[in-house]
């Protein structure tokens, strides 16, 4: 069994959440693989910047964890943190992302493609009283 770990952030700003549309067609939170020597939080901040051009900070270490098997003999763990926008202008990373959008938190659950991410969004809405 191969194990993979990715980290990302759920960035909420003024009642909207930052989502990316991957080139494969699915909508999700920005995330990516942890690079050698990087902490989980550093990975989340870097991936949001790379995929969306948005700068964020992560102050709380609240984690939302999703585990699934994307293919046979592979188990993937994705760790999301809550990010706060501190700068940058939306711009998709064309190698991986076809669109970047700030979506009203109440509509985000509908827009997100995968059920596991929908559940995380619902939990964030509850936890943050959005």
Which ranges hold each PLM region?
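N-terminal strand-loop-strand
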Residues: 1-29
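C-terminal alpha-helix
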Residues: 123-130
């Amino acid at each position: 069994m191969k194990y993979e770990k990715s980290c990302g952030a759920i960035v909420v700003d003024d009642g909207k959440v930052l989502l990316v549309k991957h080139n494969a067609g699915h909508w999700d939170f920005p995330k990516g693989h942890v690079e050698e020597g990087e902490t989980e939080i550093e990975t989340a901040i870097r991936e949001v910047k790379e995929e969306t051009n948005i700068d964020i900070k992560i102050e709380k270490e609240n984690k939302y964890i999703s585990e699934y098997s994307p293919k046979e003999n592979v188990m993937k763990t994705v760790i999301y943190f809550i990010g706060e926008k501190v700068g940058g202008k939306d711009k998709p990373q064309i190698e991986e992302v076809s669109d970047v959008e700030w979506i009203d938190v109440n509509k985000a659950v509908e827009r997100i493609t995968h059920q596991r991410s929908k559940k995380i969004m619902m939990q964030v809405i509850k936890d943050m009283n959005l």
